[in-house]
Design a protein with these regions (language model features):
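Active-site rim beta-loop-alpha module in soluble metabolic enzymes
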Residues: 133-174
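A local structural micro-motif
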Residues: 85, 150-151, 180
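Metabolite-binding pocket within alpha/beta catalytic cores that recognizes anionic/polar moieties
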Residues: 2-130
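Conserved small/polar residues in nucleotide/adenosyl-binding loops
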Residues: 182-184
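Alpha-to-beta junction loops
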Residues: 176-178
Length: 184
């Protein structure tokens, strides 16, 4: 895929509260082979750097977690030149090591989703490495940007829109992952 523009090299996929972090924004409507993204992509400046923003659930919370157009979202961002995506999220802790308000930069994930497409690959033999799902350079930068950041840990991603049952949460917590988190 070639970029149609180089408008931003970093993007944030997050909640609508992130709009306030961008200065001098302009919206870009992008069509993709996977349909429309969650919303038009806002591109603006943060500390003099061009950053794209896309609300994960849409501008008006139109999409529940299991219906977010994930492939369209990423395709749209890449078509605008984005090379790195940050996905801040509010999560639940699965043990005493993570308290409300803690900032955690995980280094692993367990994907427990089943109904969303997990790849762009639709034909041919392609095997994608995923042993280290988070970019170490970005993780280092995030951890270095704030005090009191917990490094490492495992994010368990569940389908949504429902949260896990108590038994499911206990099961995930019993796996022995340090700094276990759960996210829809």
């Amino acid at each position: 895929m070639s970029s149609v523009a180089d408008l931003a090299d970093i993007a944030v996929i997050g909640g609508t509260g992130f709009y306030a972090f961008l200065d001098d924004t302009e919206e870009h409507t992008v069509e993709t082979p996977y349909g429309a993204p969650s919303a038009p992509v806002a591109v603006g400046s943060v500390a003099g750097r061009r950053v794209a923003f896309l609300p994960r659930h849409g501008a008006h919370h139109d999409f529940p977690p299991h219906l977010v157009p994930y492939r369209a979202n990423l395709w749209a961002l890449r078509s605008l030149g984005v090379r790195q995506v940050l996905g801040p999220c509010a999560v639940g802790g699965l043990g005493a090591a993570v308290a409300p308000g803690d900032v955690v930069v995980p280094d692993q994930l367990v994907d427990r989703t089943t109904s969303r497409p997990g790849t762009y690959v639709e034909r041919g033999a392609v095997h994608l490495p995923f042993a280290d799902p988070y970019c170490p350079r970005v993780s280092d930068a995030l951890a270095g940007a704030a005090d009191d950041v917990k490094r490492g840990g495992t994010m368990v991603v569940i389908e949504g829109p429902r949260f896990s049952t108590r038994a499911e949460s206990q099961h995930y917590a019993a796996q022995g992952w340090d700094l276990s988190l759960i996210h829809i």
